[in-house]
Amino acid sequence: MDVLASSDPPSSGAFKPELSAALDPLLAFLSKTGSPFLVNPYPYFAYQDDPRPDTLAFCLFQPNAGRPDAGSGLTYTSMFDAQVDAVRAALDAKGYKDVEVVVAETGWPHSGGADEAGASVENARAFVSNLVSHLRSMVGTPRMPGKSVDTYLFAVYDEDLKPGKASEKSFGLFQTTLTETYPTGLMRNGTAGLAPAPAPTVRPASPPPAIPQVTPVQPQPSAASAATAPPRHVRSAAELPRTISALHVSACF
């Protein structure tokens, strides 16, 4: 999100001019190849900059008065939508309306230091579960209604060796025991489905059935037919496996 020079209100979204030399060829490449522009919006850090109760509700998808965008006439009820739409506005301003926005990272820490407001299990659960519900509803964002934004959650596990503040180490959705750090709404059957698979049962191999040996009787050609018949090509034992392998590879492709 640091590539944006402006993001509030979302309609004012614009990239930093000093990054044009790097961004312009990148965006042109994404447009040419039909690839998305990946961003990492974190409402948690927006709340750190403005730790008011109404901001927390806005960041957690909880009921709030909404924030009107005078530039677009739209009203926003979540920081996530506002951040995504600010990137959308920046892309549109550059002329890249065909480049999709994908959220490569977002999340909320379940714990933090005394100076890190909002880093708690309750808030992390609210953010992730409400985000999942919001995405599944397919309501979209005010600027991009009717479709869900592809979103990747950060992170699977905590990073206890990561330097920095305590919150930076505490974004994990799961414990190393394969249990959820808190209910997220992501699992169909809770965490039971994450248990290690049981070892497969190996049955003793049965002996192959005996194949009766049959000696074919070859007809004896007459002298005349033997003299006139064209030579027949009989595939050798070495040729047969090659044919079977070729058929097998073709079937795989």
Predicted regions and their residues:
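Plant P/S/T-rich low-complexity glycomodules
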Residues: M1-L38, P43-E100, S111-D150, A155, ...
